[in-house]
C-alpha cells in the first residue's frame, strides 16, 4: 500500500514537472494605472541575482500608459510578458489570470509599485530548496516615494501554521513564494483581504509557512487615506475573513481578533 502511494506521488511529481518548468520563478504582477512606478518595479526584477524567472504583468484596463511601458520592456526581454484584460476586474482576478498563464514551478508575487532587493529570489529559492518548504515569506520594509525614505521594518515570525496565522496577517504578499509541486490550488478570491484568505487556505491543508528573518523587499506606502481609517477598515475585513471565509464561530472570531489587535500594535518597530 505504501509503495503504491509512493508511486502515485512520483507520478504526480513527474506530471507537474512536465506541466511546469522546474527552477523557473513566475512573478505575478497585477497593474492598474501604474505608469508612475512600474518601471522601477520591473528594474528591481531585472536586478535579481537569480535570473531564471518570468514576469507576468496583467494590465487591468489601465487608463494611463502602463501597457506601453510594460510593452517596451517586453520587446527587449522575453521574460517580461504583458497580458491585457478586456475589462477592469480587480487585483485578485488579475493575479489569477497571471497564475493560469504561469509556466514556473514557483510562484512569487510583486505588485506594480513595490520593489525587491537584488538577492530576494536567490536567497528565498535556496531557503525553499534546501529545506523542502512549500510556502515561504520574508521580512520587508515600508517606504514612501523613494526607496531611500524607509519608514519602518516589518517584523515577521520564523514560521506560521493555520491557527497561528488566524491571529493576524503577518505575511506580506510581495514577499511570498509558493512551490506548485506541494500546493495545487493557488487561487485568489474576490473577497477583501484576498491575499490573507489564500494564505489561510493553503495553511489549512496542513502546510507551514516559513519566514526568512531578513528584509528582502520594499513596500510602497500611499497617503490617500488616513492611517486610522485604513486600520478600522482592515479590522472589519479581517472579521469577515473569520466569519465568512473561514466559517469560524463568533466566540472564536473574537478570540482571534484580540490577537489581531495585539499583533498590529507590535508589528512595526
Where are these regions (language model features)?
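Conserved nucleotide-sugar donor-binding catalytic segment
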Residues: 100, 155-233, 237
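Acidic helix N-cap motif at the loop->helix transition within catalytic regions
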Residues: 36-39, 64-72, 115, 119
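N-proximal low-complexity "stem/linker" segments adjacent to membrane-targeting elements
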Residues: 1-46
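Glycine-rich, basic loop-to-helix element that forms the pyrophosphate-binding segment
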Residues: 85-102, 123
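Conserved donor NDP-sugar-binding/catalytic core segment of glycosyltransferases
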Residues: 119-150
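Short aromatic/hydrophobic "clamp" motif used to bind/position activated sugar donors
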Residues: 107
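Short loop->beta transition adjacent to catalytic acidic/histidine clusters or analogous donor-positioning motifs
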Residues: 22-25, 46-57, 65, 77-81
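A conserved acidic beta->alpha catalytic loop
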Residues: 44, 51, 59-68, 87, ...
Amino acid at each position: 500500500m505504501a509503495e503504491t502511494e509512493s508511486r502515485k506521488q512520483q507520478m504526480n511529481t513527474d506530471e507537474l514537472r512536465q506541466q511546469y518548468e522546474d527552477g523557473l520563478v513566475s512573478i505575478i504582477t497585477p497593474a492598474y494605472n501604474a505608469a508612475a512606478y512600474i518601471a522601477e518595479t520591473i528594474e528591481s526584477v531585472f536586478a535579481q541575482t537569480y535570473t531564471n524567472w518570468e514576469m507576468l504583468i496583467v494590465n487591468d484596463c489601465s487608463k494611463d500608459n502602463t501597457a506601453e511601458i510594460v510593452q517596451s520592456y517586453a520587446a527587449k526581454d522575453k521574460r517580461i510578458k504583458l497580458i491585457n484584460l478586456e475589462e477592469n476586474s480587480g487585483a485578485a482576478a488579475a493575479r489569477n489570470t497571471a497564475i493560469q498563464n504561469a509556466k514556473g514551478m514557483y510562484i512569487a508575487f510583486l505588485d506594480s509599485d513595490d520593489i525587491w532587493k537584488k538577492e530576494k529570489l536567490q536567497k528565498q529559492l535556496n531557503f525553499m530548496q534546501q529545506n523542502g518548504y512549500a510556502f515561504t515569506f520574508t521580512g520587508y520594509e515600508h517606504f514612501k516615494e523613494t526607496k531611500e525614505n524607509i519608514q519602518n521594518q516589518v517584523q515577521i515570525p520564523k514560521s506560521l501554521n493555520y491557527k497561528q496565522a488566524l491571529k493576524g496577517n503577518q505575511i506580506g504578499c510581495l514577499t511570498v513564494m509558493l512551490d506548485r509541486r506541494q500546493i495545487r490550488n493557488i487561487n485568489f478570491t474576490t473577497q477583501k483581504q484576498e491575499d490573507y484568505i489564500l494564505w489561510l487556505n493553503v495553511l489549512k491543508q496542513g502546510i507551514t509557512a516559513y519566514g526568512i528573518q531578513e528584509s528582502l523587499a520594499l513596500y510602497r506606502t500611499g497617503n490617500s487615506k488616513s492611517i486610522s481609517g485604513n486600520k478600522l477598515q482592515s479590522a472589519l475585513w479581517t472579521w469577515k475573513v473569520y466569519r465568512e471565509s473561514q466559517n469560524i464561530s463568533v466566540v472564536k472570531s473574537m478570540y482571534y481578533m484580540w490577537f489581531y489587535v495585539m499583533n498590529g500594535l507590535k508589528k512595526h518597530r
